[in-house]
Amino acid sequence: MSIEIPAGLTELLQGFTVEVLRHQPADLLEFALQHFTRLQQENERKGAARFGHEGRTWGDAGAAAGGGIPSKGVNFAEEPMRSDSENGEEEEAAEAGAFNAPVINRFTRRASVCAEAYNPDEEEDDAESRIIHPKTDDQRNRLQEACKDILLFKNLDPEQMSQVLDAMFEKLVKEGEHVIDQGDDGDNFYVIDRGTFDIYVKCDGVGRCVGNYDNRGSFGELALMYNTPRAATITATSPGALWGLDRVTFRRIIVKNNAKKRKMYESFIESLPFLKSLEVSERLKVVDVIGTKVYNDGEQIIAQGDLADSFFIVESGEVKITMKRKGKSEVEENGAVEIARCFRGQYFGELALVTNKPRAASAHAIGTVKCLAMDVQAFERLLGPCMEIMKRNIATYEEQLVALFGTNMDIVEPTA
């Protein structure tokens, strides 16, 4: 007998489990009643404004046109599948249409019905023996280059990163080869060294290509992080090479580190007013994908005119926002005038992501600054419910610019 798991059930139960572990309620039944009642009320309040509904207004035009923001090596179809890392393979896509799917290997591994429980707090650092795959200097250099922009690795300390690099192994693939298959157990996390790959998702027995990778990116993390079967099939469309990280090492280092990061940033993220519209499970995902960046006094964080690839939240310190405008006497020596300052809990860098245009201003650190950074893909995927708040801020920005420059600097209107 085949039992189909309803869409959204896994995420719903994961969010509830996290809340139970956080609060340790004495009356579990009463806690469950309050938790799901609150979720229902939040859902009713959001209504059609929820991200992904037909009524959404943000980003549609920019997404359809391809925008001007680099996609970090992964390109999505018109109704993209959305994931938790470098636009990987692990979340459900939009309803799929008919297509000629590639032939799937019939001798695939058994799909998981239930995965083992895992508590990162209870596992000792030396519980598992270290895994080391010897590498040549050339392989090590290529591996470091492939991993330098992987968000999951951003918060690892040097010793943890060294263990990850030691444990990764090279996997050569041929054109047409299936790297992972939807429904299989998660065994490895993969980082792309070279090659192109298509992402296929099957829905109601019908498969569809929902995106592709072009010589960079990573996939396979969510099946390992959340103990769920693979949610997509990744097929090589050219000869290529991958770096794989086994399940044991991934969970020992990455998942444990992620759990520590959750403890550190959960309360901070929950305190941010502009994220109040997110559900608990959505805020936890924000914690999972953010990276930490530290800037020294005077260091540039973003530059006016650059393409936008990240969104920033100030954790500590002070950030100065400046804009260049020729012909004004009150500008600083570098031709820029200060228009704002950001402090703890405030954000910047969202304007270029909301408007799909290059950076409208520059940002510099005043003293030592620590920021939480989120890449553009995660920003679009996770902060949909907050987008209306951010769009309302554009009017405030325009008023400030008119007062300073006599014009709104065309921060919203598309350029020719």
UniProtKB/Swiss-Prot annotation:
The record lists 3',5'-cyclic AMP 2 as bound by: 274-416
Q: Which domain of life is it from?
A: Eukaryota
What PTM annotation applies here?
Answer: Phosphorylated by the activated catalytic chain.
GO:BP terms for this protein?
Answer: fatty acid metabolic process; learning; modulation of chemical synaptic transmission; negative regulation of cAMP/PKA signal transduction; response to antipsychotic drug
Alphabetized GO MF terms: cAMP binding; cAMP-dependent protein kinase inhibitor activity; cAMP-dependent protein kinase regulator activity; protein domain specific binding; protein kinase A catalytic subunit binding; protein kinase binding; ubiquitin protein ligase binding
Tissue specificity: Four types of regulatory chains are found: I-alpha, I-beta, II-alpha, and II-beta. Their expression varies among tissues and is in some cases constitutive and in others inducible.
Q: Signal sequence span per UniProt?
A: none
Which residues does 3',5'-cyclic AMP 1 bind? 152-273
Query: What Gene Ontology cellular-component terms does the record carry?
Result: cAMP-dependent protein kinase complex; centrosome; ciliary base; cytoplasm; dendritic shaft; dendritic spine; glutamatergic synapse; neuronal cell body
Q: Where is this region: Dimerization and phosphorylation?
A: 1-151
Per UniProt, which keywords does this protein have? cAMP, cAMP-binding, Cell membrane, Cytoplasm, Membrane, Nucleotide-binding, Phosphoprotein, Repeat
User: Where is the PTM Phosphoserine found along the chain?
Assistant: S83, S85, S112
The record's SUPFAM superfamilies line, in alphabetical order, gives: cAMP-binding domain-like, Dimerization-anchoring domain of cAMP-dependent PK regulatory subunit
Recorded hits in PROSITE patterns, A to Z, give: CNMP_BINDING_1 (PS00888), CNMP_BINDING_2 (PS00889), CNMP_BINDING_3 (PS50042)
Indicate whether Nucleotide-binding appears among the record's keywords: yes
* CDD domains, alphabetized: CAP_ED, DD_RIIbeta_PKA
Quaternary structure, from the entry: The inactive form of the enzyme is composed of two regulatory chains and two catalytic chains. Activation by cAMP produces two active catalytic monomers and a regulatory dimer that binds four cAMP molecules. Interacts with PRKACA and PRKACB. Interacts with the phosphorylated form of PJA2. Forms a complex composed of PRKAR2B, GSK3B and GSKIP through GSKIP interaction; facilitates PKA-induced phosphorylation and regulates GSK3B activity.
Q: What does this protein do?
A: Regulatory subunit of the cAMP-dependent protein kinases involved in cAMP signaling in cells. Type II regulatory chains mediate membrane association by binding to anchoring proteins, including the MAP2 kinase.
What family does the Swiss-Prot or TrEMBL record give for this protein? Answer: Belongs to the cAMP-dependent kinase regulatory chain family.
Write down what this protein is called: cAMP-dependent protein kinase type II-beta regulatory subunit
Gene coding for it: Prkar2b
